[in-house]
Amino acid sequence: TMQRILGEHAFDGKNVTVIGYGPVGQGFARRIRALGAEVTICDIDPVASLKAVFDGFAAQDIDEALPCADMVVSATGVRHTVTLEHMRAMHEGAALAVIGGIANEIALDEVSDFTPQVNRDTVQLNVPDGPTLTLIADGDGVNYTVGGGNPIEIMDLSFAVQASAVAYLLEHRGTLDHTLIDRKSVV
C-alpha cells in the first residue's frame, strides 16, 4: 500500500526507521529491505533490538535514528509512540506513517492546526517549531485506511477461529483447568 501511495521506487536507497520490532514491524522491515531500503529498527525492548541486529538490521535509539530517516514508520500499537518532539527532530520532507496501529500512535493531537483530510493518501503536516513532514493516511494505519485492508478470506478465517474459541469456552464453562489446551483436543 505504501509503495502504491509513494511510488514504485519509494524505498530505493531510502533510510527508513521502523519503530517496533514485533511481528508487524519485522514483516515490514524485511519487505522494504527487499525493496532497497536501508532499515533501522527502534524498539524499547533490548531483546527485540538484539533480534533485529541478528536479522541484519541496524538498531538505534529513536532519538538517534529520527534525524537521519527519510521515512519513519510506527508499528507499536502504543499511543504517542511518535511524540511532538520526535516529529520536530525529523528532517524536512520526511514521510511519517503507522502500520497496524491505534489512534494517536503519532501524537497528532498535540499538533494544534492538524485537521484530518478525507480520502487523502498523503498530506503535508506542518509541525509547530519543526519541519514539514509528509503524513501518510492521516497518521492512521496505512493498511486499513488507504489500502484494501485484509482480504475477506483472511477475515472470515480469523472470525471463524474466534467464534469457535468462544463456543468452546461456553460449552465447557466451569470445567476448564487453567492450563494450556492441547490443539488436538480442540479439533
Please report, for each region that a protein language model flagged, where it lies by residue:
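Adenosine-phosphate binding glycine-rich loop
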Residues: 1-8, 108-187
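Glycine-rich adenosine-cofactor-binding loop
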Residues: 2, 7-33, 40
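Secondary-structure transition/capping motifs at alpha-helix termini
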Residues: 8-9, 36-39, 60, 90-93
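Residues in the short beta-alpha loop(s) of Rossmann-like NAD(P)-binding domains
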Residues: 22, 44-45, 102
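Short, solvent-exposed amphipathic alpha-helical segments in soluble enzyme
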Residues: 31-35, 88-91, 112-114, 150-153
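NAD(P)-binding Rossmann-fold cofactor-contacting core
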Residues: 33-55
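Rossmann-like adenosine-cofactor binding region
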Residues: 49, 55-131
